[in-house]
């Protein structure tokens, strides 16, 4: 099997794999269009314009035919069309399909986040999740959309946590060289330390361990836990969270059979290749994990929302308003999110 170092198969291996199965066994993959003013449609159109996507899955986009046509024209992409359907169950396995769930009167304002684009993003997401809950699609990949679109929920993980009434939902970043999880996610910096608790760290370690065993078939995941303070506290010289919170959480995890190690100072762990000895890294907060991940993996990584009863992935990057409509967005992250969607269900 042609595996990337992350343990996931490459997109083109998935193409080869799926052709060994008949159409009836192929996954129906839902896509949400994300922010209509961002690069979401560009990523989707570029990926769907490759005929091989129908060797991978039956694709169903939840969005707007009018907006899709607008972006296709802006990108000057010829010989591409979407098959409009009323219900995902009616999807043609040999075509790229679209379920129109957004008002055609929506105004596209490239490069700008607007209340209208936020509403359109969450409308498409809710329509896709309803289809997923009804088993009309098997799995879902989301194009980039802003946090404002999830209001009143504070972020994407909170939105999904509330919808599926589950406490522990965590974005797991997956790249070729590393995987990264988080104890806290979108919080003001002043609130981070107060949310670093023994229980919070332990439950995230437990979630990571279960996810890597079930979804990535790693028998005994090695988890590197990052410290919170400079030099991991330097024997409490720069803070006591390592001694009083992080180490007790690691010990509790190890007592329960989880191979958690640390805490490690991020500058030491990421300065060379030491991080490659671990199956996954647990960061204490958003930027602590996101910066090294994007530095090493670029925008080619994908995000799996761990802890859900459904399978949902997305890209690691945002709407990229600064390059919207220019035709230069890299669809690799979306392609890798699709690869992961097609692989993970075999282990569910």
What residue ranges belong to the model's regions?
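N-terminal polybasic/positive-inside topogenic patches
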Residues: 6-7
